[in-house]
Amino acid sequence: MANAKGKVTQIIGAVVDVQFDDALPEILNALETENNGKRLVLEVAQHLGENTVRTIAMDATEGLVRGAVVTDTGGPISVPVGAATLGRILNVIGEPVDEKGPVNATETRAIHQPAPSFDEQSTSSDILVTGIKVIDLLAPYSKGGKIGLFGGAGVGKTVLIMELINNIAKVHSGYSVFAGVGERTREGNDLYHEMIESNVIKLENLEESQVALVYGQMNEPPGARARVALTGLTLAEQFRDQSGTDVLFFVDNIFRFTQAGSEVSALLGRIPSAVGYQPTLATDMGAMQERITSTKAGSITSIQAVYVPADDLTDPAPATTFAHLDATTVLSRAISELGIYPAVDPLDSSSRILDPQVVGEEHYQVARDVQGILQRYKSLQDIIAILGMDELSEEDKLTVARARKIQRFLSQPFDVAKVFTGSDGVQVPLEDTISSFKAVVAGEYDHLPEGAFYMVGGIDEVIAKAERMAAEAA
């Protein structure tokens, strides 16, 4: 019941117990109280009996005291949605945190929504071209699909996400929503300023911006980190339903969503499951992931960075995420150590739509040929390490030479990484990617040195670089 009043009876970190006199608020209702002169939102998680509810705080609870008055809002957390949120940074409860004044939205939506029903969903499969060779060729993204970027710490997940926002926001006229979940505040700040520089956010006229940002970073309490992905998703759903276009929804990092859930789970008195995660891990993940889908109105394509604890893909958090994905882009430390960026593992990454019926026979065949050569090279590496290259047959030597060229050709300079590489980013059209790799596999460029294939765009750049290298050597 809206406006029912209660009192705080117990505070344990991010978990607050509230006792009501008569009407109990429903599960997932938002309650409000004041703490240090600021509005503090609590979300009901459990009914404990004796008219007491256990809630999760969406902000710090330092300074909150027993006996503080709490009001039931009568519904779930609601956030502003629509064009007014473009170019803005919001927090989990929809308040602006960018010091640009209030968000003058005409509509608000509850962050907890049911997933679209079967008859509302769309079933077509189309490729979403990113301009990044290794992704478009070997693990293509589908429109309205869910894509996971897997990788340990520091192998380039956030850089790849920023490049995708950069490429797709420019090529696509659609909107993007970026949810920063439990990641570094510095990265969130960098991303915001880079978006201003690249005109994705237009400060003079915010409503012409292409992106809305929702942040719940590492320093936030677990309640905020466990809900901020839902806040971002609610914004994306409204853009999809209102504009009927492809909306891009970026989550960095989906692991932190699970981690925040596990932090509050023990405080809520649940018995932990494998590796200390919450027993409701699969349920929490499913409730969010099932909302990310294509409907008849439009699509939400979601790209989610997945931190892999200790590089262990069998950990319950990444393993549960795998089940929901249409494509996986696995970033490998071994490849980043070779200096090949993006450090995408061409053999571990996969996509549901790498299928001749979706991408076409030629694309499928070239991708499989490239993977075949790289797989053969991988299996020969032990022999090379022990006996050296000279012990290989002529055919294997040729395979190794081509594989090393392919490996380098899968690297690419990024716009957003210009400060590291010193060279301008390139986007390669899908047709060029397919024809270039087809020619390399067929041996048409066996005469070029492997260094010419490193950090370039299309095959024309390889030829130009090889000529430059020959001129310098002479």
Curated annotation (Swiss-Prot):
Catalytic activity as recorded in UniProt: ATP + H2O + 4 H(+)(in) = ADP + phosphate + 5 H(+)(out)
Residue ranges that the Swiss-Prot or TrEMBL entry lists as coiled coil: none
Gene source species: Ruegeria pomeroyi (strain ATCC 700808 / DSM 15171 / DSS-3) (Silicibacter pomeroyi)
UniProt xrefs under PROSITE patterns: ATPASE_ALPHA_BETA (PS00152)
CDD domains, A to Z: ATP-synt_F1_beta_C (cd18110), ATP-synt_F1_beta_N (cd18115), F1-ATPase_beta_CD (cd01133)
Main localization, broad class: membrane
Residues annotated as binding ATP: G151, G152, A153, G154, V155, G156, K157, T158
Protein name, UniProt field: ATP synthase subunit beta
Subunit structure: F-type ATPases have 2 components, CF(1) - the catalytic core - and CF(0) - the membrane proton channel. CF(1) has five subunits: alpha(3), beta(3), gamma(1), delta(1), epsilon(1). CF(0) has three main subunits: a(1), b(2) and c(9-12). The alpha and beta chains form an alternating ring which encloses part of the gamma chain. CF(1) is attached to CF(0) by a central stalk formed by the gamma and epsilon chains, while a peripheral stalk is formed by the delta and b chains.
The EC number(s) this enzyme carries: 7.1.2.2
Lineage: Bacteria, Pseudomonadati, Pseudomonadota, Alphaproteobacteria, Rhodobacterales
SUPFAM superfamilies noted in UniProt: C-terminal domain of alpha and beta subunits of F1 ATP synthase, N-terminal domain of alpha and beta subunits of F1 ATP synthase, P-loop containing nucleoside triphosphate hydrolases
Record's function text: Produces ATP from ADP in the presence of a proton gradient across the membrane. The catalytic sites are hosted primarily by the beta subunits.
This protein's GO CC annotations: plasma membrane; proton-transporting ATP synthase complex
Subcellular compartments: Cell inner membrane
Membrane topology label: Peripheral membrane protein
Pfam families: ATP-synt_ab (PF00006), ATP-synt_ab_N (PF02874), ATP-synt_VA_C (PF22919)
Name of the top EC class for this enzyme: translocase
GO molecular function, one term: proton-transporting ATP synthase activity, rotational mechanism
Record-linked InterPro entries: AAA+_ATPase, ATP-synt_VA_C, ATP_synth_F1_bsu, ATPase_a/bsu_AS, ATPase_alpha/beta_chains, ATPase_F1/V1/A1_a/bsu_N, ATPase_F1/V1/A1_a/bsu_N_sf, ATPase_F1/V1/A1_a/bsu_nucl-bd
Encoding gene per record: atpD
UniProt keyword list: ATP synthesis, ATP-binding, Cell inner membrane, Cell membrane, CF(1), Hydrogen ion transport, Ion transport, Membrane, Nucleotide-binding, Translocase, Transport
